[in-house]
Structures are given as C-alpha cells and as structure tokens.
C-alpha cells in the first residue's frame, strides 16, 4: 500500500506506552494498536524511502547506496546492558546504512517525527580519522560551513561528544565544537501539525535526507576508513 501518513492514534500509543510499559499492557492494550497504527504505516514509509534512495544518486555520492533498503526496527528493547528494564521502545525507528558507520535515520515517537543523517563510529581509530580531517584547514572549514548551513535550516547537530576537548587541541581552536564529536546525528524534528497524518510526512523525511547529503558526502570522502571495492562500486579514498 502507499504511505499516507501516521494516524493521530500512533502518537497516542506512545503516550500510553510511556505511562505503562509493561508486558501485560502490551499484550492487552498496545500490541494490536502498534501493528495497525505504527508498524503498518512505517513499513509503507520504509518501502517508499527505499525506492527514493535507489532512484536517487545517493549511491554515486557515497560510494554505496543502501542496497538492502530501509530497515524497520522491532518494538522490543535489548535490555541486557541497560539499567532500564522496560521491555518496549518508546519510538518506532527505521534506518538505512549507506556505508559502515554512515547512514540515514527516521523515527516516530509521542512528540512527532524525527529524521537525520548519522555518523556512528565503532572504534577510536575512526574518531581519530574524523578529527584529523576536521583539523585540516580545507576539510575542516568545509565541514564547518556545511554544519552552519544545516543549523540555519533548522537542523540540530547532536550526537555523543566530549564535555571538554580532545587531548592536544587548544581551547581557542576555531572548530572545537566539531572536534568534540565522537558521533554525529544531524536531524530535524517535526510535530504533528507539520503534516504527519498525511503523505506529507514522507516528503519531510526525503527533504531532510536530501538536505543532510553534503554532510554524508564529506564524511564518506574524508572521515571514513576506505572500504574494499565490491561489485564494481566505487569507494571513496
């Protein structure tokens, strides 16, 4: 089916889940609503976004293209390493990996819709490679300009970061804010009145993903560890 938006009841489900996140409540009151009001439209949105990415030139710009399509997360939390043992997620997420440590994200929660581009390194060496690129005058200035344009468009540049500064970086470094990052999530949030209950919600995600492309392109070209060539796909060096 064609994606036509999330019903108002989808957001109310997450309000109710925040009030009672128990297995019994899920079985008796939440599960059927989740499948109908959240999961079904998110599956439709994921299919639509997969087609969008496949038909766009994300593949050429990043050296990949998310050939597996947009993946929709399940509702059950992994609580093994968490002090919070509540069993169910308070959001519905979906993601697309473009390259290792680089991808696109969207989620729905009780506040509305959030879409972003993400860099999520798994090792300190990857963070070091990113910081070296930021410290270079040409690459660092380019990233600072990209970040400034995104913030002017209403993006928030979030993600895990140091509270102080990396070792050896002076306190007056012009790009200290960028150098503090250990992960980057550049995204925009949309409330219910932005059109979430219509097909406009899909347009908002596509517009956000398109706007964040310069950041993803910069990461692919300058900050990621080069990947082996596979199936004729050009990988940035």
Put a short name on every predicted segment.
Residues 59-66, 78-88, 187, 196, ...:
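N-terminal low-complexity, intrinsically disordered segments
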Residues 39, 63, 68-71, 76-94, ...:
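Soluble extramembrane domains of integral membrane proteins
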Residues 70, 112, 181-183:
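Sequence-level motif detector for i,i+2 pairs with an aromatic at +2
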Residues 11-75:
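Active-site acidic/histidine clusters and adjacent loop/turn architecture
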Residues 1-17, 21-23, 41-46, 50, ...:
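Long, solvent-exposed, polar/charged low-complexity segments
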Residues 31-38, 119-120, 128-135, 197, ...:
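Short histidine-centered catalytic/ligand-binding loop motif
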Residues 78-138:
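Aromatic- and glycine-enriched beta-alpha-beta binding-site module
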Residues 116-167:
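A contiguous pocket-lining binding segment that forms or flanks enzyme active sites
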